[in-house]
C-alpha cells in the first residue's frame, strides 16, 4: 500500500491513464472489427471506407503510446491485404 502522498497520487494517476488507454485500445479494436466484418461480408466499398477510417485510429494509437508501431503496421497491412483480395 502506498504510504507517501506522491505514491498515492501516482496510483490515482495510473488508474486514470489505464482507463483512458483501455478506451483507446477498445476504440481501435472496434474500427478493426468493422473492416473485418465488411471483408467477411464481401462488401468491397464498405471495407474500403472502413479501412480508410481505421488507419488513422491505428496510428493515433501509436502516437498515444498504446500500440507499438510495428503492431499497427502489421494490423493495417493485413486488413489492406484482405480488402485488396475482394474483387
From Swiss-Prot:
GO terms for molecular function: small ribosomal subunit rRNA binding; structural constituent of ribosome. GO terms for cellular component: small ribosomal subunit. InterPro entries: Ribosomal_bS20, Ribosomal_bS20_sf. The keyword Ribosomal protein applies. Pfam families: Ribosomal_S20p. Gene3D superfamilies: Ribosomal protein S20. One of its GO terms (biological process) is translation. Keywords: Ribonucleoprotein, Ribosomal protein, RNA-binding, rRNA-binding. Binds directly to 16S ribosomal RNA. HAMAP family: Ribosomal_bS20. Belongs to the bacterial ribosomal protein bS20 family. NCBIfam families: S20. This is Small ribosomal subunit protein bS20. It comes from Zymomonas mobilis subsp. mobilis (strain ATCC 31821 / ZM4 / CP4).
Amino acid at each position: 500500500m502506498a504510504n507517501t502522498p506522491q505514491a498515492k497520487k501516482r496510483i490515482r494517476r495510473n488508474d486514470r491513464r489505464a482507463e483512458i488507454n483501455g478506451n483507446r485500445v477498445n476504440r481501435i479494436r472496434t474500427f478493426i472489427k468493422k473492416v473485418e466484418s465488411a471483408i467477411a461480408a464481401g462488401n468491397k466499398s464498405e471495407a474500403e471506407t472502413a479501412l480508410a477510417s481505421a488507419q488513422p485510429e491505428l496510428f493515433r494509437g501509436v502516437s498515444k503510446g498504446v500500440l507499438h508501431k510495428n503492431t499497427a503496421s502489421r494490423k493495417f497491412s493485413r486488413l489492406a491485404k484482405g480488402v485488396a483480395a475482394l474483387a
